[in-house]
Regions:
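Acidic, polar ligand-binding/catalytic clefts
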Residues: 92-158
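Periplasmic-binding protein-like
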Residues: 136-144, 219-257, 278-286
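C-terminal motif of bacterial Sec signal peptides marking the signal peptidase cleavage site
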Residues: 7-11
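Bilobed "Venus flytrap"/periplasmic-binding protein-like clamshell domains
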Residues: 43, 48-50, 70-87, 119-121, ...
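Extended ligand-binding regions for polar small-molecule ligands
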Residues: 79-82, 86, 148, 163, ...
């Protein structure tokens, strides 16, 4: 009997270890997911939400200042709903909540299952949150006003004497500090509207942003008479956008499976072609 109990105990211990390291196939069904609210997928993003990541305007009564994510338009909104579908959720079971960018990395409980907000995956951020695999890869670019001296820049060295700006807490700001290393301390702004205003009013000579956003700023004339001066070389592993989850949330396994499927079946590529401008012709600033 003792021997039999030992065998049973050993079997139970083995099963528990296996479940921890390798979730069963059914674990990604809605009923098995680690969610804020059962039966509902809660997704966070900032307010306002910006093109090309969110689009479609703001329906009457919406919480969002513009580009309500529930329209399913814009790259990140479309990706979020595609992930939700892979996880077994109908669109009606998806709820969006407002999460300011600067609050994403604070410790403690989260109000969302995952957040999409053009968040670049970095080692420092991984200390406080869990990231999904990448759903978009990009590099940094420079935007300036047409005809200004900075637009003649052909290299990173040509930018040393100019005043640059970026949004707080972004890899764009880090790129300025670590790679461009201008003579002047770069200006830091709370959101993209403030960054754009800095360029419009002449407070800065140029904006550093991810390349798709650079083409939206210029193409949609968010900053009138602006131009993409060029794109910067990828340094290290490059810039990857990942969904943000609470630190250690095992939901990431299922989100990663969904993203892998969307990559394999061509959905991510189709959504990029639909919502994000081509950046092939941007000159490289070495």
């Amino acid at each position: 009997v003792v021997a039999l109990l030992a065998v049973v105990a050993a079997g139970c211990g083995s099963t528990k270890k296996s479940a921890s390291s390798s979730p069963p196939a059914t674990s990604c069904e809605p009923g098995h997911l680690n969610l804020i609210k059962k039966g509902q997928l809660t997704i966070g993003t900032d307010n306002p939400a910006y093109n090309p990541w969110f689009a479609g305007g703001t329906p009457k009564g919406s919480t969002w200042k513009f580009n309500d994510p529930t329209t399913q338009k814009g790259y990140e909104s479309a990706v979020a709903y595609a992930v939700a579908k892979q996880l077994g959720f109908a669109s009606s079971a998806v709820k969006w909540v407002v999460v300011p960018f600067e609050q994403l990395f604070r410790p403690g409980a989260k109000s969302y299952d995952f957040d999409v907000n053009q968040v670049s995956v970095t080692p420092a951020r991984k200390k406080s949150v869990t990231f999904s695999s990448s759903y978009y890869d990009t590099n940094q670019a420079l935007v300036a006003i047409k005809g200004t001296p900075i637009t003649k820049a052909k290299s990173i060295a040509d930018l040393k004497s100019y005043k640059l700006g970026a949004q707080v807490g972004t890899t764009s700001y880090d790129y300025i500090i670590k790679n461009i290393k201008p003579d002047h301390q770069p200006s830091v702004y709370n959101n993209s509207n403030d960054v754009n205003s800095g360029l419009k009013t002449g407070g800065i000579d140029g904006i550093v942003v991810d390349l798709p956003t650079a083409f939206i700023i210029t193409g949609a004339e968010e900053v009138p008479n602006s131009v993409v001066v060029g794109r910067f070389p990828v340094v290290g592993v490059g810039d990857h956008f990942g969904a943000v989850l609470a630190k250690g949330n095992n939901l990431v396994t299922c989100v990663n499976q969904a993203i892998a499927t969307l990559k394999a079946n061509g959905t991510l590529k189709q959504l990029q072609n639909k919502w994000i401008s081509s950046a092939a012709n941007a000159p490289l600033l070495k």
